[in-house]
Amino acid sequence: MDTKIVVLNQGYDQTFQAREQRLIETPAGHGELVISFSGRLESCYAMELCRAGGVRVRALTLDNPLLSRRELARARRYCLHHGLEQRVIKTEEMLFCDANQLPPGARDPLQLLDEARGRQADWAALPLLIPASLEEMQAYLGRFGPLPGHTLWPFAEQGMSHRDFRYGFHRRELDRWGKTSGGYLNRRFQDLSQIQGHQVQMIDMAEQLLADMGFDEAQVFFHPLGGEHGALARIRLPAHQRAHGFDRQQDIYRALKGMAFDHVTLDLAQPRRHEIKG
């Protein structure tokens, strides 16, 4: 009997390819532009399609406390390999790009990006492409109002969801530049009004350490315990790494307690919908 291979996502893939072709053609009309390039999977996928369309792209990376070192390294590797001009602007101000998770008084993230671009005299007149999903654009509109006129949102305007970005990222094998690190680091905190720079750094370093131990998809959540009880690191592992994590829990505990965490717990349960999303 002949073996039959059933392609489960054939219809989705065909629709996706047609939309992807439109997304390649749309930015091409601008000739050259600046892309907000954080190294997140959305920005890597957007950069890939702009390059495919022959657009001359410049990468603007705002190196702020909420950008993980792994994503920054991925952005550098990508630009270096493809010979792209990248300017990394260092700032101690936190760039909260997720409009669904903003602390009171948080600045408009596009304002920070625009200020950084404005300091680059030869880039100031170029349009700024925002590699955001439809969900992110809707959240931005709800929080900050109309989109700035000098920005381009082709992916959101084509209805690209976060799921679509992830599909395109893996379809084009962009994880060869480094595994995704679970999105914005501010998602590792429950109370954003109390978030501090050194706490974000602790989380980022802990996730890097776990990646070096073989847990490259681990997420570390920060929980202040109050008083003299210090801070708790809650480690969440994907299903396929939980058994290995259980076997090495003592190594994990020792490693993270050496990073100023007072308590460490390994979360082996499947996250519920109301928990923090990574």
What residues fall within each predicted segment?
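Mid-to-C-terminal catalytic subdomains of enzymes
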Residues: 156-160, 166-221, 228-229
